[in-house]
Amino acid sequence: MQDPAAYYQTMMAKQQQQQQPQFAEQEQLKCPRCDSPNTKFCYYNNYNLSQPRHFCKSCRRYWTKGGALRNVPVGGGSRKNATKRSTSSSSSASSPSNSSQNKKTKNPDPDPDPRNSQKPDLDPTRMLYGFPIGDQDVKGMEIGGSFSSLLANNMQLGLGGGGIMLDGSGWDHPGMGLGLRRTEPGNNNNNPWTDLAMNRAEKN
């Protein structure tokens, strides 16, 4: 009778010689188009283990093992922008001459109105709620070009009789624990918050 350890070793050696790779990742296949051994496994088509996809590095084409070969041109996976670059460079070369001709033929403003030239430029950063700050033509902003005329002195949000005072001087309920003082009716001229906010908006 044969030693079981020796029998096991010989059987394992035979299996390794006869056994082909179990997964497609381990296979080194030749390209079916150019017969190059310079190939690699990429992925399984639709996650199906029976359809491994391979890539040939020499002819730069993909194929599925056991599948039909498509008529794909060599290097079809790469993008070449050389034609786009040449057309864009030729159009950019002709554009400076066109722009210089446009500058020569451009007419000055047909209606040179001094009132229009004195209007301030409407910078989009100076827009607040859709109204340009400092534009005197907007109704409701005739006084100094600010929104301070639109604010009521003691406007209050109704929160059960109390609420937040919008004049910026404090909270209506001093027990809020924030250390802010109670609004006093005679202290409206001494309110730094609304003037500070309006001055900040006007300086921009």
Curated annotation (Swiss-Prot):
Among the Pfam families in the record, one is: Zn_ribbon_Dof
Compositional bias per record (Basic and acidic residues), positions renumbered to this chain:
106-124
S-S pairs: none
User: Where does this protein reside within or beyond the cell?
Assistant: Nucleus
Which InterPro entries does the UniProt entry name for this protein?
Dof (IPR045174), Znf_Dof (IPR003851)
Q: Tell me if Transferase is a UniProt keyword of this record.
A: no
Q: Where does Zn(2+) bind?
A: 31, 34, 56, 59
Its cellular-component GO annotations read: nucleus
Keywords assigned = DNA-binding, Metal-binding, Nucleus, Transcription, Transcription regulation, Zinc, Zinc-finger
Region annotated Disordered sits at 1-25, 70-128, 182-204
Where on this chain are zinc fingers (Dof-type) annotated? Answer: 29-83
Q: Which GO terms describe its molecular function?
A: DNA-binding transcription factor activity; transcription cis-regulatory region binding; zinc ion binding
Question: Where do Low complexity bias regions lie?
Answer: 84-102
Q: Name one GO biological process term.
A: regulation of DNA-templated transcription
By its UniProt entry, which PANTHER family does this protein fall under?
A: DOF ZINC FINGER PROTEIN DOF1.4-RELATED, DOF ZINC FINGER PROTEIN DOF3.1
Function noted in UniProt? Transcription factor that binds specifically to a 5'-AA[AG]G-3' consensus core sequence.
Q: What name does this protein carry?
A: Dof zinc finger protein DOF3.1
What gene is behind this protein?
DOF3.1
